[in-house]
Structure formats: structure tokens, C-alpha cells
């Protein structure tokens, strides 16, 4: 009998930035080794299998187990791993040591404590391929565009037209990360309403995608916003995602296809700029130019009786060389704008950066415009009916 005994398996991807080697460029091997030592001790006690990787200065813990989502033991294990890595980071005087650990001690769940988390639970299919995405220098809304392409755009995913098990479409769970609420939208019927929301990178993020015909989980994203948790800028959220592929879900090639055409995402230097999301292999996930451009890696696994077979470093494929060239061209063009919009994020997305502190120094130096007065709606009105020069 298989070790799973027909039980559901849970895939948990939990990430944190606990220190970078030379700025924000890389989580060094010493930190990964510290995490691996903690996870190895928990095999067969808490988890079934694990893989530790990095994207830029973020450590990503990929774990399989049978304890379900939001399990205290699994989350506590990840927290301990990050704590041990933080100890090493402080010994090495790494930049930003422990920066994503926003609480002094673990309290049952990493959500709201700094680390990002994406988890899904399912019964293994006859063959269970999954793709784990890890990003650096961007935030959860970076997945809005590619997830829409994967699960709602037939020009990207031919299976939406040709696969009878997908033709009924997918359901999107969208989170208002500012208002702390969510909504479910069905595609293709509610596609336009979905786009009205997820095109807003400031407020709305896709959290999960479900197959409509049986409500089976298809994808999940970490949507934790560090700035709203900490109350100040402590780094970009650097999201992770899990996507199931094949046999009733988009094929692996359809899951990867959206990244063949790089799109602009918020983040990059100081979390304050728009820039391209560049797909790279694990070895190239070391953003240096202006702390970027933002990177994304894609690791393919086969889940076999709860074990993680792999990974296959999917974006290392030569087929994405042109995408990388495009991303660098996009970076060249938008970098010319320097501190000006549209390279610089709008003021509403800079609220938790250091910009407001800079502007505070000018507050007392502003004076009213002569002959004009502001009205509450943000427009202007004349003080009297006469002409004002």
C-alpha cells in the first residue's frame, strides 16, 4: 500500500527574506543549509518531503505533508527554519537580517507575521505535476496577469477550447488586499468584471483559482502584504505560487506561456518602481541591476505518494531566452524615466515607502495659490465671480 493511503496531500510553500549577501541580491548557501537542517529533522514527523530554494534574497521552503493547510506544526517548522537562518545571517552581518520576521515569537500561523505562504490540499491524481513559482522584487499582484492568461485566455491556453474537462471554465478568488475582503468570479461569463478588478495592481490580487466543474483547486498565490502588516516599508512581498498542471488543468507549456511575453510589475528598486518580470533559471535569480529587474523562477515537480520528485528548472530552458531579452529591453526603456512616472509608482502605492518622510520636510513650505482655493473633491474654484489673473 502507498504511504499516502489515499489521503490528501498538502503542498506548502512558505518564503521569507532573512538576509542578503551584498545588499538584496542573494540568500547565500549558509542560510539555505540552516533551513535544510531544520526541515530534515522533521521528515516523517511533520512533513513527508521538502525542497529549499531561493529567488534573489528570499528563501523558499517547498514542503509536502498530510496535515492540511494552515497547520500549526508545519508553519511552526517553517518559522524555526527561518529563525535558524536569521541567526546565521546575523553572524555573517548580512543585509536585512531577519527583516521578514515581524514578530518576536511564533503564534500558531505565519500569516500576518511576515513570511509569505501559498498552500493547497488535494487528492493525488494518477499523475500529479505541479509548478511552483517564486518571485523576488515584486508583490502578489504580479501573478494577476499570468494567472488570467493561464486559466481564462484561450489564446494562451488551447485546453480551454479543446479539453472537455476545462471547457466549463475556472473560478477566481480575488482578494481586496486593502479592504481585507474577497469575491469569487466565474469565467468566461464574468471575465470582464474579473479584469476590472485584477487590472488594479494596487488593490486586488488573485488568491486562488478553482476548476468550476468540480471546484477542484488549480492554483494558489501568497497574497500577504508586508507593508500593511508592518505599517512601514520593509521590502517587497516577493510572492510564491503553486499551479497544478495537465489532465483537466492547463498543460505545463500553457502554464509557462504567459511568461514568454514579460509584463510590467510593481517593485524593483526600493519597491517603488514599475519594471519587467523576467523569467530565469535558479542560477540566474540574482537581481543586481537597480536591484532587479524583478525575477521569477518556475520549478516543476511530480508529486508521488506525497514525495516531491524533481525539480525541473523550467525557466532555464533556452525557449525563454527571447523573453529575457525582451525584459531587458523593457528595463532599458523604462529606466530612462528615472524618478519620473510611469517608472516611479504612483503616490498611492508609495504610502509605505520612505517617500512620505521626505515630503514631510516640505509640508510647512507649501503656500496657497493666489486667487484660487481647493475644494474637497480635489478640484479648484475661483474665490469670487470676477476674473482672476
Curated annotation (Swiss-Prot):
GO molecular function: fructose 1,6-bisphosphate 1-phosphatase activity; fructose-bisphosphate aldolase activity; magnesium ion binding
Alphabetical list of InterPro entries matching this protein: FBPase_V, FBPase_V_sf
Binding residue positions for Mg(2+) 4: 237
Active site, per annotation: 17, 233, 236
Residues that coordinate or bind Mg(2+) 1: 17, 24, 57, 99
Keywords: Carbohydrate metabolism, Gluconeogenesis, Hydrolase, Lyase, Magnesium, Metal-binding, Schiff base
Annotated pathway: Carbohydrate biosynthesis; gluconeogenesis
Matches recorded under Pfam families: FBPase_3
EC number(s) stated in the UniProt entry for this protein: 3.1.3.11, 4.1.2.13
Binding-site list for Mg(2+) 3: 236-238
GO biological process: gluconeogenesis
Highest taxon of source: Archaea
Substrates-to-products reaction catalysed: beta-D-fructose 1,6-bisphosphate + H2O = beta-D-fructose 6-phosphate + phosphate; beta-D-fructose 1,6-bisphosphate = D-glyceraldehyde 3-phosphate + dihydroxyacetone phosphate
Annotated residues for binding of beta-D-fructose 1,6-bisphosphate: 24, 95, 108-109, 137, 246-247, 270, 291, 352
Binding of dihydroxyacetone phosphate, residues: 24, 137, 270, 291
Reported cofactor(s): Mg(2+)
Binding, Mg(2+) 2: 57-58, 136, 238
Subunit structure of this chain's protein: Homooctamer; dimer of tetramers.
PANTHER family on file: FRUCTOSE-1,6-BISPHOSPHATE ALDOLASE/PHOSPHATASE, FRUCTOSE-1,6-BISPHOSPHATE ALDOLASE_PHOSPHATASE
Family: Belongs to the FBP aldolase/phosphatase family.
Function as written in the Swiss-Prot or TrEMBL entry: Catalyzes two subsequent steps in gluconeogenesis: the aldol condensation of dihydroxyacetone phosphate (DHAP) and glyceraldehyde-3-phosphate (GA3P) to fructose-1,6-bisphosphate (FBP), and the dephosphorylation of FBP to fructose-6-phosphate (F6P).
Domain notes per entry: Consists of a single catalytic domain, but remodels its active-site architecture via a large structural change to exhibit dual activities.
Protein name stated in the entry: Fructose-1,6-bisphosphate aldolase/phosphatase
Name of the coding gene: fbp
